[in-house]
């Protein structure tokens, strides 16, 4: 399966931030494992009664679902060569980054208690899932090179999961 070459925005930055570079892979593996560990910790806390949520409620949170998608996308992108990824990979990567940005914004604007955004004495999983991954998702999308140019219509497809989740929560 052939893919198109990466977009040459700036040759020097394109080579430095190529997803197949070893240091980019290491960062992505650590981020992916940290993200999935934070979600697993949330589910473990729910299963053992350490949180107010049940396991089903914890698995139903958009934050946890979006972070699982993001963690898997980051890990798969880290362990597989860019040339072996399918042509739709950038769309999935873009959707995961979009979900992370939405998670961060909704947390910051609607969910966090007043004054909580300035505190760092929170549960590490909370910090990872609501602060680190949203910022990392945005930075990764902006800086890691893409395999093809993105049309303006593609982000509309990324809305499918959040809209389905919204309908699910309303029903």
Residue positions per predicted region:
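Aromatic-rich, lipid-facing transmembrane alpha helices and their immediate juxtamembrane interface loops
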Residues: 2-171
């Amino acid at each position: 399966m052939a893919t198109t070459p990466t977009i040459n925005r700036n040759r020097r930055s394109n080579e430095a931030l190529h997803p197949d570079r070893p240091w980019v892979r290491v960062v992505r593996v650590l981020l992916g494992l940290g993200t999935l560990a934070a979600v697993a910790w949330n589910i473990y806390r729910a299963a053992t009664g350490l949180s107010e949520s049940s396991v089903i409620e914890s698995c139903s949170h958009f934050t946890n679902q979006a972070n699982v998608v993001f963690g898997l996308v980051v890990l798969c992108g880290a362990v597989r060569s860019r040339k072996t990824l399918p042509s739709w990979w950038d769309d999935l990567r873009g959707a995961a980054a979009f979900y992370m940005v939405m998670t961060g914004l909704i947390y910051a604007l609607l969910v966090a208690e007043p004054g909580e955004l300035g505190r760092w004495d929170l549960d590490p999983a909370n910090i990872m899932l609501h602060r680190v991954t949203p910022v990392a998702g945005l930075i990764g999308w902006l800086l890691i090179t893409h395999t093809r140019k993105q049309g303006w219509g593609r982000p509309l497809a990324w809305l499918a999961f959040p809209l389905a989740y919204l309908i699910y929560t309303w029903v």
